[in-house]
Structures are given as structure tokens and as C-alpha cells.
Amino acid sequence: KNFAGNRLYRVACGPSGADYHWTEVMMQNLTPALTDAIALHFYSVPEWNNKGSATEFDDDAYYSVMDCANEMEQLLKMHTAIMERYDPENKIALVVDEWGTWYDVEPGTHPGYLYQQNTMRDAIVAGLSLNIFNKMTRRLQMANIAQMVNVLQAMALTDGDRMLLTPTYHVFRMYNVHQDALFVPSDYKAGEIVSETGRRCADLSVSTSRDRHGVLHVSIVNPSLAKAKKLTLAFDKLKPASVEGEILATDDIHDHNTFENSELVAPKAFDGAKIKGRNINLTIPAASVIVLEIK
């Protein structure tokens, strides 16, 4: 109940993963007077009984997590389609109340505290996920990574009076240019990466927005461990005058920040995007996240 001029934002317990029947039944019975949103719960975990190490993993384990992370887009599309049938006026939102990676806890830590390290693999998952969320904002109103500090795919890790920022934090900071901006549709026909054991994921992920000053920001993720990807950004009405960017990438996908080396994984300036007429050409290194600012 609302008191003292405050208004509660009420979120109904929604589905876990691909439980579309749950969403169907909920939407048959909910009204905007009862709730503001339904929550979707999904982690990028291929095997719950064998989550694996956060820092020691082979290529197949890497691509299995990418495959799982990419599943988020299909989940959002399917749940949204159900909600559209019952709520075409978009009065009930969809929120992702928990998402992210989940591995075995770090050796020597309490199993109930879910403390795990955070590598470039997690940065790629963060970038892929945020790009997906950007595309779905008509219905999707909130997406909460789990969690902020010292738990699962955290932004920061602490030890006494020491603190470090994780690769996931850096992706979130790079992507903050999309906040309060207007989503700009872009057409990219993604190819597919297929691992030796049949794991699949899109070969590139792209999302674009325009801020209140008219500046375009393009976030790009290349999840391939082995191949750089050439990309041409072609604009119908804009003739770009300048482009600059940041990149998050390292030589080893297992790289992570420690209290002894807290800046091993950190963004750097990216000057590899070149303007040619109405196009911008660039090469996205393997296993990297890039955000461009285009004026």
C-alpha cells in the first residue's frame, strides 16, 4: 500500500528461464492494478551440478557460458511475446531480477557466501547481456546483475580495507553512456561461432544509442577467442565527423584483477576506428568489448 506520497513499484514473482507456462498463467490473472512488472530469473550457468572454476576453464567451458548468455535474448523475446498478447498497451513491465555468471566458489572461501573471481570471460558476458537488454527496452524496464560486491558476478571485490574493480565493473562503466539515451536500431546479420564440441554463439554483438546531445554510442562485443572481426558501420543520414572509443581486452581470457595486480584488466583508449565517407571501419580484436563515441 502507498503511504505518505510514496508509490511502491510492485514486482510479481515471474518465471525461471524458459518457463513460459508460468508467464502465460501470470498474465492471464494479473492486472496493472495488482502489479507493475513480472520478474524473469536467469543465470548463464550451463550445468548447475558442475559450474566449474571462475578462473580455470578451457575453450569449451568458455563457449558453453557464451551459449548460455546468448540464450537471454530468446528468453526475453518469448516472454515478451506472451505479455504482448495479454497486455498490448505495455502497462506491465518485464524485469530481469537476477542475471549473470555463477561458478564454484573460490577455494578456501565459505560455500554459502558465493565469492568468485571475475575474468575477461565475465566481461564478455556482461557486454553481450547489456547489448541484449538495450534492444528490449520497450517492455524490459530493469535488469539487476547478481550481485554488486563479493558475490557472484560482482563489480567489486574486497579484502579488509582493500578493494578492486572487476572486468565486469569496467564494462558497466563503459556502457553507462547508454543510460537515459534513445535506442537506435541497427541491422547486423550475425554469423555464428561453433566450438569444437558444438557450442554456439553469435560472432558479434552490437547496440547503438543516441544521447540528448545527439552523440551516438555503439557498444560492440566480439566473443571469439581466436578471430578478430572486421566491421563497417554504415550510416544512412549521418556523416560522422569524429570517432573515438575505449576497449577492454587482454592477451588471455583468464586474466583477472587481484589485490596484488588490480589494474591487469582495465579499459584503454581505442583508435582503430576510421571514418571513410558515411562509413566507419574498424577491426574488433578477439574476446574484446569496445564502446565508440561518434559525432
For each feature predicted by the language model, list its residue ranges:
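Aromatic-lined carbohydrate-recognition surfaces of secreted/lumenal glycan-active proteins
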Residues: 1-20, 71-101, 139-150
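The substrate-binding groove and active-site-proximal loops of carbohydrate-active enzymes
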Residues: 9-16, 56-73, 112-122
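Flexible loop/turn segments at secondary-structure boundaries
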Residues: 17-22, 44-49, 100-106, 149-155, ...
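Alpha-helical scaffolding within the catalytic cores
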Residues: 19-30, 128, 202-203
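Aromatic- and acid-rich polysaccharide-binding/catalytic face
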Residues: 24-70, 92-93, 97-102, 115, ...
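Conserved, mostly hydrophobic/aromatic
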Residues: 38, 79, 98, 143, ...
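Aromatic/acidic polysaccharide-binding cleft in carbohydrate-active enzymes
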Residues: 91-206, 215
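C-terminal beta-sandwich/jelly-roll accessory domains of carbohydrate-active enzymes
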Residues: 187-191, 196-201, 213, 221-295
